[in-house]
Amino acid sequence: MDIVGGQNLRQMWDDLAEVYGDKTALIFESCEGIVRQFSYASLNEEINRTANLFHSLGIRKGDRVALHLDNCPEFIFCWFGLAKIGAIMVPINARLLGEESAWILQNSQVSLLVTSAQFYPMYREIRQGNSTPLNHICLIGEQLPADDGVSLFSQLQARQSATLCYTPALSTDDAAEILFTSGTTSRPKGVVITHYNLRFAGYYSAWQIALRDDDVYMTVMPAFHIDCQCTAAMPAFSAGSTFVLLEKYSARAFWGQVRKYQATVTECIPMMIRTLMVQPAAPTDRQHHLREVMFYLNLSAQEKDAFTERFGVRLLTSYGMTETIVGIIGDRPGDKRRWPSIGRVGFSYEAEIRDDQNRPLPAGEIGEICIKGIPGKTIFKEYYMQPEATARALEPEGWLHTGDSGYQDEDGYFYFVDRRCNMIKRGGENVSCVELENIISAHPKIQDIVVVGIKDAIRDEAIKAFIVLNEGETLSEAEFFSFCENNMAKFKVPSFMEIRTDLPRNCSGKIIKKNLK
């Protein structure tokens, strides 16, 4: 089923501007509370001016341009402005440091970067090191540094026409983006995402949450992340909805922002749900218009139930990854939830559980979750310049090996067990980190928890728990280990525990385990 046809992102925005005109497309709120708002017509003009800006700097179809930005309207301008001229966006995680950012610039062969004054000193050092092909920086800010090869985004954009001046032929198979994976266990890989991928994501994710043009979709997810782009922005724009982009997440401000913008849909990661739950209860907790809250792994059933009971919202599970573009397994708005199931496979996809010999497994047996899609259309096209890595993950028939363990029941509902790399091998037993984390998170003194495997000369691996306590709490080792012994099999009880003030996380809220080992 082809729901995109031949429509690329340039055509999408031209059509949206014509159909929705003065309807509000984008609302942005900064950390200081400054609000900027754009209609579909005015946003398309900003996108065109930005496309012309890139053309004036020598960018042509197929060229790669990096963005290192926090959430801001300019990210949206650049994303679609580059797509309109057939150039390729390379978004960089705003939390990355110099060496990691330079590595991405080098591996994607980027010569032009758009960034803000906050990150400029880091890139000045990178350019001085001559380790990358970066030769020009377009700066979002008020003051132009006295350095060669730097220009102000606002000045350049203001000089441009609102009519597109460069319109090369585009195909939906053309790359629109190279999105580097989070790299929690190794160097990130560049996931190539096409015009078709993004257009499909818009239609698919809008279907997943039954999105309409009178909806308001609010997100605090970082714009450089697949969730913001393909689960929030693309469906909101594709449906003619209003997209509300907040610069940063604040647990104290979140519900006020939901009410302020009358948001009907939002998305949360587990960290957000947990921090919202520790805010003081208020009479206004249920005074909002939210009908769906999309969330991503992992939450325990107790956490889900407590959240929905307190705030009166429906949680909608969505399971996916950068390579799948969207949440290919999940709940549907009209379905009864079957927790702890992560839902059923969505349209245009197939899913199987396979063993170590790549053979399908029957219901109830744990194996690897494998997804079948169409490369470059419903799943990613390839890893940039890494054919061997592409071949390992993606079979010729379109089967993608997720690296996740799970099983399905007789009714086709899928259950996530753990990342295969998160399975701890302890004395011949496979122990799921997620299972232990869900059990330990039920302790009333514990706010956050992560479990890792560490080398053990006798039993392959020992289990260590890193813990963040609720404010004002103390927890002894004896109390912790007693709780574990009473709630899990003996071979699953951690050997070590360490209390920390926080845990290292990437932009999507995933804990960076390599920083803990």
From Swiss-Prot:
Q: Which domain of life is it from?
A: Bacteria
Top enzyme class, one word, equals ligase
Q: Which GO terms describe its molecular function?
A: carnitine-CoA ligase activity; crotonobetaine-CoA ligase activity; medium-chain fatty acid-CoA ligase activity
Biological process terms from the Gene Ontology for this record are:
carnitine metabolic process; fatty acid metabolic process
Q: Which UniProt keywords apply?
A: Ligase
In the UniProt record, does the keyword Ligase occur?
Answer: yes
- Enzyme Commission number(s) from the entry: 6.2.1.48
UniProt KW Ligase keyword: yes
Q: Which SUPFAM superfamilies match?
A: Acetyl-CoA synthetase-like (SSF56801)
Query: What pathway is it annotated to?
Result: Amine and polyamine metabolism; carnitine metabolism
Catalyses which reaction(s): 4-(trimethylamino)butanoate + ATP + CoA = 4-(trimethylamino)butanoyl-CoA + AMP + diphosphate; crotonobetaine + ATP + CoA = crotonobetainyl-CoA + AMP + diphosphate; (R)-carnitine + ATP + CoA = (R)-carnitinyl-CoA + AMP + diphosphate
Which Pfam families does the entry mention? AMP-binding, AMP-binding_C
PANTHER family attached here?
ACYL-COA SYNTHETASE, MEDIUM-CHAIN ACYL-COA LIGASE ACSF2, MITOCHONDRIAL
Report the protein's function.
Catalyzes the transfer of CoA to carnitine, generating the initial carnitinyl-CoA needed for the CaiB reaction cycle. Also has activity toward crotonobetaine and gamma-butyrobetaine.
Q: What's the family? A: Belongs to the ATP-dependent AMP-binding enzyme family.
Query: Mind telling me what this protein is named?
Result: Crotonobetaine/carnitine--CoA ligase
Q: Which organism is it from?
A: Salmonella paratyphi A (strain AKU_12601)
In the UniProt record, what gene is named as encoding this protein? caiC
